[in-house]
Amino acid sequence: MKERLYELKRQALEQIGQARDLKALNDVRVAYLGKKGPITEVLRGMGALPPEERPKIGALANEVREAIQQALEAKQAKLEQEEVERKLAAEAIDVTLPGRPVSLGNPHPLTRVIEEIEDLFIGMGYTVAEGPEVETDYYNFEALNLPKGHPARDMQDSFYITEEILLRTHTSPMQARTMEKHRGRGPVKIICPGKVYRRDTDDATHSHQFTQIEGLVVDRNIRMSDLKGTLREFARKLFGEGRDIRFRPSFFPFTEPSVEVDVSCFRCEGRGCGVCKGTGWIEILGAGMVHPNVLEMAGFDSKTYTGFAFGMGPERIAMLKYGIDDIRHFYQNDLRFLRQFLRV
């Protein structure tokens, strides 16, 4: 029995050494250590041996099995390492080959305009305020002097979630929230960019989701002339030197007086063209002096503090700057459109 075990060990180690791949190695493992292998047969036949020989033969059988197992593991590790080296050699990179150019992403034209507007006002000392897109009825309407029953609160114009919760219809709620945080003490000087939602039918000039940038300044002795000077500077930096603006009377519930703001046409220099519809002026935003009711509801004394506010649609400004005739282009992810705005 001893001789047989020694011979099995010799044969197994020889075949392990000759194995050229993992499959051949596994065949050796099954042949010698499997349930039907010779080592297992020896252990099963221990009962036929004289009692005094069983411990010695059992110990030898376990020793042989352990030696074969260790040889199998060592050979497997060697074969796996050789396989890794073969793959590395096959996949070697030729460092002398020219590199492939990396395609860089570019800002979306709308994002570019929003960032440009933000940078202009930050340069004037404004800070950027942010707020929730899912807003309460109070901040979206009441705090902005839009009482119950006002047409702008109609269910047909807003996306209501509950009777008191809706998707904000403008970024003005951020102004009300910011003024509240100041607890009646100025100055306040912010811009509020963000997405807004209205129940509009999507067409060339309307979208159910779009962006707004609103601005607010509250302090002592703020006048209409401050508003005009700010917006004239904004127009000149955004549309080019030589631009002028004009105010036209209008109405917004949260400002009094309220104005529509036009900029002199940057296409025809005021001579009249298709962009300005022959008038020499292009409407770009709405503005006005903050209504005393809005100041009071936010905790400011309207006899001590005054302020101005303005709001614009970056989509409209981007359409004017780049000659885009359909707002839907901004949201369709058409690469033919977007690639026209690649930065060099």
Swiss-Prot record:
GO cellular component: cytoplasm
SUPFAM superfamilies, sorted: Class II aaRS and biotin synthetases, tRNA-binding arm
Primary subcellular site in the record, as a coarse category: cytoplasm
Gene Ontology molecular-function annotations: ATP binding; catalytic activity, acting on a protein; magnesium ion binding; phenylalanine-tRNA ligase activity; transferase activity; tRNA binding
Gene Ontology terms describing biological process: phenylalanyl-tRNA aminoacylation
TM regions (residue ranges): none
Cellular compartments annotated: Cytoplasm
Catalytic activity, as annotated: tRNA(Phe) + L-phenylalanine + ATP = L-phenylalanyl-tRNA(Phe) + AMP + diphosphate + H(+)
Enzyme Commission number, as recorded: 6.1.1.20
Classification via Pfam families: Phe_tRNA-synt_N (PF02912), tRNA-synt_2d (PF01409)
Residues bound to Mg(2+): E256
Broad enzyme group: ligase
Highest taxon of the lineage: Bacteria
Swiss-Prot/TrEMBL keywords: Aminoacyl-tRNA synthetase, ATP-binding, Cytoplasm, Ligase, Magnesium, Metal-binding, Nucleotide-binding, Protein biosynthesis
Cross-referenced InterPro entries: aa-tRNA-synth_II (IPR006195), aa-tRNA-synth_II/BPL/LPL (IPR045864), Phe-tRNA-synth_IIc_asu (IPR004529), Phe-tRNA_ligase_II_N (IPR004188), Phe_tRNA_ligase_alpha1_bac (IPR022911), Phenylalanyl-tRNA_Synthase (IPR002319), tRNA-bd_arm (IPR010978)
Protein family according to the UniProt entry: Belongs to the class-II aminoacyl-tRNA synthetase family. Phe-tRNA synthetase alpha subunit type 1 subfamily.
Subunit note: Tetramer of two alpha and two beta subunits.
Protein name: Phenylalanine--tRNA ligase alpha subunit
Lineage: Bacteria, Bacillati, Bacillota, Bacilli, Bacillales
GN (gene name): pheS
